[in-house]
């Protein structure tokens, strides 16, 4: 069998059209969602990613701004800027682009974001709400993964789902979202023994560790659904996923490519959460 290719670009395009329609409806009520992104320093990849978010937000009718601070900015300066945005009533959602320079504590900054404007979903309050099944803002990559599975009409109930990676950004939250859909979830990580035995029994594999070629054809069950979150640049700058794509697609039931799989949905869910933040503060039901 040859796998169904889960085209993240097309799924994102369709989803963003729905978001654009909702933004237009909000504007008719006199409200325009605004996304503010804090960028500290001049890291090329971060600058590119921030520009992509701004462009995507504006394309669906939102307002977006980049607050660019110098690489030498102190933690206090970043916190002051963040506090200004927290108190700015025109701002619906805030995100802080990571990584941050070494003099700035990432955790301290993330905890200083107003939880009601935390469109990345990384504030401890929002993480906690996810774990008691009362989530509002969910981290964007896990949310995007669930949209891909939903779009592909993958029934997760009772399925064996294996998540490789235990980060707070992807691995742990996506495991919780899969549990909410009644999947039986196993989390594997760098200390796990005999990973192959778990993978061979998996109906769904989500790999998010950044190790190209980690998931090979011999450990994938025929018909399994493969979600590849890896995006490691090779020596030529070409992005590689965690999955041996060309081989695994010959046996899998469905698979995401890299690039063009999960990535487009991550930015889309930033927009989704920004819209949600605006609706919540205006008392408008989603």
Curated annotation (Swiss-Prot):
Pathway: One-carbon metabolism; tetrahydrofolate interconversion. InterPro entries: Aminoacid_DH-like_N_sf, NAD(P)-bd_dom_sf, THF_DH/CycHdrlase, THF_DH/CycHdrlase_cat_dom, THF_DH/CycHdrlase_NAD-bd_dom. Disulfide bonds: none annotated. Pfam families: THF_DHG_CYH, THF_DHG_CYH_C. NADP(+) binds at residues 165-167, 190. Catalyzes the oxidation of 5,10-methylenetetrahydrofolate to 5,10-methenyltetrahydrofolate and then the hydrolysis of 5,10-methenyltetrahydrofolate to 10-formyltetrahydrofolate. This is Bifunctional protein FolD. It comes from Staphylococcus aureus (strain MRSA252). The gene is folD.
């Amino acid at each position: 069998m040859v796998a169904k290719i889960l085209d993240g670009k097309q799924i994102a395009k369709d989803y963003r059209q729905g978001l654009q329609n909702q933004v237009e409806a909000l504007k008719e009520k006199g409200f325009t969602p605004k996304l503010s992104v804090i960028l500290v320093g001049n890291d090329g990849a971060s600058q590119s990613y921030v520009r992509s978010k701004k462009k995507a937000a504006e394309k669906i009718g939102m307002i977006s701004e980049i607050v660019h601070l110098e690489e030498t900015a102190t933690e206090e300066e970043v916190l002051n800027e963040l506090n200004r945005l927290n108190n700015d009533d025109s701002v619906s959602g805030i995100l802080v682009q990571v990584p941050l320079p070494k003099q700035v504590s990432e955790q301290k900054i993330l905890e200083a974001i107003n939880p009601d404007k935390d469109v990345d979903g990384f504030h401890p309050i929002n993480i906690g709400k996810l774990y008691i099944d009362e989530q509002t803002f969910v981290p964007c990559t896990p949310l995007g993964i669930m949209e891909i599975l939903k779009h592909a009409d993958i029934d997760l109930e009772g399925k064996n789902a294996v998540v490789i990676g235990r980060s707070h950004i992807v691995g742990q939250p996506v495991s919780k979202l899969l549990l909410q859909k009644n999947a039986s979830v196993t989390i594997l990580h760098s200390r796990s023994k005999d990973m192959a035995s778990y993978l061979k029994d998996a109906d769904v594999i989500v790999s998010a560790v950044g190790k190209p070629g980690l998931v090979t054809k011999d450990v994938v069950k025929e018909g399994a659904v493969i979600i590849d979150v890896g995006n490691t640049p090779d020596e030529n700058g070409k992005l590689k996923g965690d999955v041996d794509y060309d081989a695994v697609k010959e046996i899998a039931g469905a698979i995401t490519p890299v690039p063009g799989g999960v990535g487009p949905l991550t930015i889309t869910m930033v927009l989704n959460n920004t819209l949600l933040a605006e609706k919540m503060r205006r008392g408008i039901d989603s």
